[in-house]
Amino acid sequence: MTASFAFTIEHRDGEARAGTFATPHGPVYTPCFMPVGTQATVKTLTPAQLAETGAQMILANTYHLSLQPGADIVAGAGGLHGFMQWPGPILTDSGGFQVFSLSSLRTIDDDGVTFREPKSGALVRFTPEHAVAVQNALGADVIMAFDECPPYPADREQVEGAVERTLRWFERCVEAHRRSDQALFGIVQGGVWPDLRRRCAEGLVAADLPGYAIGGVSVGEPQTLIERVVRVTAPLLPEHKPRYLMGVGTFREMAQAVAVGVDLFDCVMPTRVARHGSALLLGTGGDRRINLKNAQFRRDYEPLDCVCPCYTCRHFSRAYLAHLVRSEEILAMTLLSIHNVATLTRFAALLRCAIATGSFAQEFAHYLQSGPEPVLSN
């Protein structure tokens, strides 16, 4: 493993860990929430605004950036860091999630995936080698192996095929990876079948990569099933490497995953709901979301959250934000995105602090209560 990607666990509380993941663009203190900048931008936020939220590491998408503006253009600017002027660590997804999300626009074979580009209708071919080459050109600190993300629900035969293809593609990604200053992570698939999750994890772990991800969750399955799949999968991954849960970012989901040893998270949710006029509030009663379109906020002169240190809460009232939302002003999206991203980064920091003081289970008990235990497929 490249020395610059060392992962150090500094504190433990049960299975929960607080650590530091070293990257060429600085350390990442875990647990860590990563905002999503699909098109090399976290929507409506400048890099300076993003940094002020406490964001440490962000995510960009290989598939979309390969289409627009093209990996060669990004590389010509010195990679993503120079292109988007983000000084901190960056992670790029491989395009594997688009195998799921663009299922009506793609065909899969053992060599790779052919997508039909939504705007032009042009055919775009992605293979493991191409996914790695594009990510090498984009220059992120962490890059992901190309995988097949099956939908939910899916029958066992379909998921088993996705696992076998993911493992074969993974071997090709490892062979194609050329840059020692980028950490390649493998992605565990397997749907809701524990034995398939184990089969996939064992195949990936044998390569001794700098880190591993849990994929194929939050693709339509119920919340209790997400929790169970993560609980089954996390222990299959090396405990001295960072563990990344892809596409998950609510308070409850993060706390539940941290409790079983997950370190990294990403999700589009905080900025997506901000663009629709909603704010996330961090309290003792679990997830809470308020919609500023509601009439009750028109004369509410309090900040969104009186203890939140973000720019939005330091300067503006709910009444002003409600006015911006009702007026469909772009500033509403920016101010709510600042607050929502800051809230999730603050939540991750609170998780870290509780782990360090040995109070994680007590302080986050209201998030750790599970619903009825789902039955996973045999």
Swiss-Prot record:
Coiled coil: none annotated. Its EC number is 2.4.2.29. Residues 247-253, 271-275 are annotated as: RNA binding. Transmembrane segments: none annotated. The active site is at D93, D266. One of its GO terms (molecular function) is metal ion binding. One of its GO terms (cellular component) is cytosol. It comes from the Bacteria. It catalyses: 7-aminomethyl-7-carbaguanine + guanosine(34) in tRNA = 7-aminomethyl-7-carbaguanosine(34) in tRNA + guanine. Gene3D superfamilies: Queuine tRNA-ribosyltransferase-like. Substrate binds at D93, S94, G95, G96, F97, D147, Q189, G216. Pathway: tRNA modification; tRNA-queuosine biosynthesis. Its cofactor is Zn(2+). Zn(2+) binds at C308, C310, C313, H339. The keyword Kinase does not apply. Binds 1 zinc ion per subunit. The keyword Transferase applies. GO terms for biological process: queuosine biosynthetic process; tRNA wobble guanine modification; tRNA-guanine transglycosylation. Pfam families: TGT. Keywords: Glycosyltransferase, Metal-binding, Queuosine biosynthesis, Transferase, tRNA processing, Zinc. Catalyzes the base-exchange of a guanine (G) residue with the queuine precursor 7-aminomethyl-7-deazaguanine (PreQ1) at position 34 (anticodon wobble position) in tRNAs with GU(N) anticodons (tRNA-Asp, -Asn, -His and -Tyr). Catalysis occurs through a double-displacement mechanism. The nucleophile active site attacks the C1' of nucleotide 34 to detach the guanine base from the RNA, forming a covalent enzyme-RNA intermediate. The proton acceptor active site deprotonates the incoming PreQ1, allowing a nucleophilic attack on the C1' of the ribose to form the product. Belongs to the queuine tRNA-ribosyltransferase family. Homodimer. Within each dimer, one monomer is responsible for RNA recognition and catalysis, while the other monomer binds to the replacement base PreQ1. This is Queuine tRNA-ribosyltransferase.
